[in-house]
């Protein structure tokens, strides 16, 4: 095409020179006529002889003919000189360029099974703490007392519901819940032991140290600590470790030990873990060269099929999943090798087309875009799009008949569903109106947009009516995936007539029938161009058969490594495919077989398994959190935050760009799913022990007492002088939750007006301020006025304040005869006192086992050399030499 342009400019220059010469000749003729008339009219006699100018003109004519022949030779030479420019300068514009999104690929490959995390400590909500004892006058005693307090007492500031605290606690438990516990890995030395014994973890050891050093600890307890050590039963592969735990923490850890996810691992399990189709593939040799020990363990991946049906009405989520799957699939599709030399093939095509300097432009376009990069890109795009079920769109030029004829092969081999409808219709319409209808002399097809039938389906009927027989290409209209469930996974399988390449032979018959038609309404050049294009493709029948088998084999081999159902729904965005790159693939495919290496297959399989397993675990977490929120009566809790957190933990989604309607639809689907048993049991454990957890917190009260008359502060051993009530004897009680639910505050108002204190019972947060004066100033405004006047209980925050020897206001009590009072009292139950004997537990686990996360590392795999490349029907993939 480049040499055409240059030739065209040379011809244009020649034409310009001719025009200039013609003008000069006209002027000369006029001058000659004038001179001739003058001579005729003049009476002078002149002798006429040959002028020197005429002799010069003859010489110039001879020279010009020589120059024209030289220019013609130059024009002919440009074809050879500029073939490379044809290939690289102009035509590479039509090559599809794929830019791999490295970040998405890295995110996918970085998803590792979370089972690999190693536990170094037991799970704990509580820890024992030493608290001082206060005398009646507010001074500290020298003795102290041990209480169980919350390890993470994190109630955020602001309007916060205690129920949300428990929801966050549950989320924390789910995050820290171990998949397996091996106590030997976390055991540490007991410093106070007589015989270098070990306790279960470092926190147990530090508690033992603190108790041992406490002066008030009994001698019997010290002696017991000195005896604390592990007990091994080697014959049963069991070890017992002493631990110091709150009874609730013990229940958690005992549950984790009893419900570990690890299972015994042996060679059979590993071999069966490999997809069956790869195990049975004669092109691969799989071998295991060692046995696993009896202590080998693994965690079975969670490969439940998609319970959310993300392909159904989740357009942006589905688009993201298919995009990431497409990028992953492209990275594992093998590169073509030993392709036909591009220059040699273009030269051969030029000879077949009998290209000359003055050949019509439509035939020179046949060579457009043919190069090995485009061929390889097309091969990878087709297989990766089918594996990820990404929709493709076709890009083509109607005047390039060769690319349209190549498109006929593409539509024969790749199911119609893989292309966006509008693009498929446009391509089929171009083929019908450019090749098929002109062959029979039929008028152009005018396709009505939105017609349920495709142009090919309409053409099939019209040609049968027009000519009495079709062109034998009806199979292209029935080219759909077959849905087959293999090993519990829905696979989109190519039809058997594609896999055994019968369709290629039928395609060739149809093309040959088209080339034999007369093209009655078209010029001869048009007919010749179409026939030559068909000839170019039919000359490579053997290679097309091999290419189709190669495409099908690579697709099906990689498909065996897909673990999630291959749902087919058209995607929002599409992968562009140039028909010129399809021409490159058809014309340059050689006879070298390429199949995925075993290492590539294993890598692809592992990444798919890890993503799928993580996906299911995150679904289980989200379902559990939603169920917990409902059970805790958090009706006003925004579920969108839970769904956003779920999507973030899947790594591949840009959560901020997901539309709200899809977020809420996702929430509704998550609500319908059942909770996984382990997560449900854990929540029930928390629910049963909410009272103990509230008691251990310094920020949660069990109620508030309000009155019109001031109530005196009372002495408390744990705090000094405080507005804390330890029991509700003598108070009228109202349930805080019922009050908030009904909104009827008349009962409280009546009681307060009758000077009767009211106790509102229920968990609620309280704030602490050490300045008594500022507290007394705030009290009426913050608590009393809100309940009686505004009647809003949901913002109630009872205020705890204390006056003791640690307080800034202790001097008020020490130096003055002043009795501090308050209109509110905080109802707070006493936390559980630490008792060494009740906190001492023995935990049992396996003495030793080894958890393997990468099962395929034990399998040595190789391809059969030389590659037999046998397809599903025991025929060689590449037969053509």
From Swiss-Prot:
Any one GO molecular function term: RNA binding
Biased composition (Basic and acidic residues): 19-30
Primary subcellular site in the record, as a coarse category: virion
Region of interest (Hydrophobic), residue spans: 394-414, 422-442
Alphabetic keyword roster: Capsid protein, Inner capsid protein, Repeat, RNA-binding, T=2 icosahedral capsid protein, Ubl conjugation, Virion
GO CC terms in record: T=2 icosahedral viral capsid; viral inner capsid; viral nucleocapsid
InterPro entries, alphabetized: Rotavirus_VP2
Subcellular location: Virion
Pfam families: Rota_VP2 (PF05087)
Site (Interaction with the intermediate capsid protein VP6): 220, 224, 228, 840, 842
Annotated region described as Disordered, given as residue ranges: 1-45
Modification after translation (UniProt): Sumoylated with SUMO1 and SUMO2. Sumoylation of viral proteins seems to have a positive role on viral replication.
Location of the region described as 5-fold hub in the Swiss-Prot/TrEMBL record: 1-80
Family to which the UniProt record says this protein belongs: Belongs to the rotavirus VP2 family.
Function: Inner capsid protein that self-assembles to form an icosahedral capsid with a T=2 symmetry, which consists of 120 copies of VP2, with channels at each of its five-fold vertices. This capsid constitutes the innermost concentric layer of the viral mature particle. It encapsidates the polymerase VP1, the capping enzyme VP3 and the genomic dsRNA, thereby defining the core.
Domain notes: The N-terminus binds RNA. It is necessary for encapsidation of VP1 and VP3. The N-termini of 10 VP2 molecules form a cylindrical hub underneath each 5-fold axis of the inner capsid.
Oligomer and partners: Homodecamer; each decamer is made up of two conformers of VP2, called VP2A and VP2B. Interacts with a VP1-VP3 complex. Interacts with the intermediate capsid protein VP6. Interacts with NSP5. Interacts (via N-terminus) with NSP2.
Name of the featured protein: Inner capsid protein VP2
Species whose genome carries this gene: Rotavirus A (strain RVA/Cow/United Kingdom/UK/1975/G6P7[5])
Source lineage: Viruses, Riboviria, Orthornavirae, Duplornaviricota, Resentoviricetes
């Amino acid at each position: 095409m480049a040499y055409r342009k240059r030739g065209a400019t040379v011809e244009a220059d020649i034409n310009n020179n001719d025009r200039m010469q013609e003008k000069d000749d006209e002027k000369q003729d006029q001058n000659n006529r004038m001179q001739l008339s003058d001579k005729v009219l003049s009476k002078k006699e002149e002798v006429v002889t040959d002028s020197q100018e005429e002799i010069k003109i003859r010489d110039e004519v001879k020279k010009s003919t020589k120059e024209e022949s030289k220019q013609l030779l130059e024009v002919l030479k440009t074809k050879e000189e500029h073939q490379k420019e044809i290939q690289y300068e102009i035509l590479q514009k039509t090559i599809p360029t794929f830019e791999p999104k490295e970040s998405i690929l890295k995110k996918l490959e970085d998803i590792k099974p979370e089972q690999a995390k190693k536990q170094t400590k037991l799970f704990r909500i509580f820890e024992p703490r030493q608290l001082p004892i206060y005398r009646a006058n507010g001074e500290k005693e020298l003795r102290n007392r041990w209480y169980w307090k919350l390890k993470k007492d994190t109630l955020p500031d602001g309007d916060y519901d205690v129920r949300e605290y428990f929801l966050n606690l549950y989320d924390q438990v789910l995050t820290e819940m171990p998949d397996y516990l091996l106590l030997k890995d976390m055991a540490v030395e007991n410093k106070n032991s007589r015989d270098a014994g070990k306790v279960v973890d470092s926190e147990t050891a530090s508690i033992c140290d603190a108790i041992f050093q406490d002066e008030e600890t009994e001698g019997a307890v010290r002696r017991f600590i000195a005896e604390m050590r592990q007990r091994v039963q080697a014959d049963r592969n069991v070890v017992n470790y002493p631990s110091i735990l709150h009874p609730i923490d013990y229940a958690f850890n005992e549950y984790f030990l009893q419900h570990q996810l690890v299972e015994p691992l042996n060679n059979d399990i590993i071999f069966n873990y490999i997809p069956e189709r790869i195990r049975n593939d004669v092109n691969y040799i799989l071998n295991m060269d060692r046995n696993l020990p009896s202590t080998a363990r693994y965690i079975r991946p969670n490969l439940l099929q998609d319970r959310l049906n993300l392909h159904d009405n989740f357009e942006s989520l589905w688009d993201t999943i298919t995009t990431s799957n497409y990028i992953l699939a492209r990275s594992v599709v093998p590169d073509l090798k030993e392709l036909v030399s591009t220059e040699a093939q273009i030269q051969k095509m030029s000879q077949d087309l009998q290209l000359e300097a003055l050949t019509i432009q439509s035939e020179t376009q046949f060579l457009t875009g043919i190069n090995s990069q485009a061929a390889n890109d097309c091969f990878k795009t087709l297989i990766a799009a089918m594996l990820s079920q990404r929709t493709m769109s076709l890009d083509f030029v109607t005047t390039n008949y060769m690319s349209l004829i190549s498109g006929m092969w593409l539509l024969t081999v790749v199911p119609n569903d893989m292309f966006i409808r509008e693009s498929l219709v446009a391509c089929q319409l171009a083929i019908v109106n450019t090749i098929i209808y002109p062959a029979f002399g039929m008028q152009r097809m005018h396709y009505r947009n939105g017609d349920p039938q495709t142009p090919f389906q309409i053409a099939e009927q019209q040609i049968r009516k027009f000519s009495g027989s079709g062109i034998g290409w009806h199979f292209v209209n029935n080219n759909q995936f077959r849905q087959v469930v293999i090993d519990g996974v829905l696979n989109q399988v190519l039809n058997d007539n594609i896999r055994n390449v019968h369709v290629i032979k039928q395609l060739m018959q149809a093309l040959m029938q088209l080339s034999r038609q007369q093209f009655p309404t078209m010029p001869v050049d048009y007919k010749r161009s179409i026939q030559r294009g068909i000839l170019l493709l039919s000359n490579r029948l053997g290679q097309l058969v091999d290419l189709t088998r190669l495409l099908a084999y690579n697709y099906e081999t990689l498909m065996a490594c897909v673990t999630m159902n291959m749902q087919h729904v058209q995607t929002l965005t599409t992968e562009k495919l140039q028909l010129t790159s399809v021409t490159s693939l058809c014309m340059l495919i050689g006879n070298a077989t390429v199949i995925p290496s075993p290492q590539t297959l294993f890598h692809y399989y592992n990444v798919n398994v890890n993503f799928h397993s993580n996906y299911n675990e995150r679904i289980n977490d989200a379902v559990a959190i939603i169920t917990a929120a409902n059970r805790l009566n958090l009706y006003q809790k925004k579920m969108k935050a839970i769904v956003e957190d779920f999507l973030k933990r899947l790594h591949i989604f840009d959560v901020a760009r997901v539309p709200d309607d899809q977020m809420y639809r996702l929430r509704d689907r998550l609500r319908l799913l059942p909770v996984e048993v382990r997560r449900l049991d854990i929540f029930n454990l928390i629910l049963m022990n909410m009272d103990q957890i509230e008691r251990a917190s310094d920020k949660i009260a069990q109620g508030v007492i309000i009155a019109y008359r001031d109530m005196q502060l009372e002495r408390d051993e744990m705090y000094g002088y405080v507005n804390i009530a330890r029991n509700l004897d003598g108070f009228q009680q109202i349930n805080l939750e019922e009050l908030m639910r009904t909104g009827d505050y008349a009962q409280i108002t009546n009681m307060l007006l009758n000077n009767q204190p009211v106790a509102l019972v229920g968990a609620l947060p309280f704030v602490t301020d050490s300045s008594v004066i500022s507290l007394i100033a705030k009290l009426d405004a913050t608590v009393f006025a809100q309940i009686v006047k505004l009647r809003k209980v949901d913002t109630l925050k009872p205020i705890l304040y204390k006056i003791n020897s640690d307080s800034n206001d202790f001097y008020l009590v020490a130096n003055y005869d002043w009795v501090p009072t308050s209109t509110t009292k905080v109802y707070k139950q006493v936390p559980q006192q630490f008792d060494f004997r009740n906190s001492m537990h023995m935990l049992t686990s396996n003495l030793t086992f080894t958890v393997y996360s990468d099962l395929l590392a034990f399998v040595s795999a190789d391809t059969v050399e030389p590659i037999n490349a046998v397809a599903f029907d025991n025929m060689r993939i590449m037969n053509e030499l």
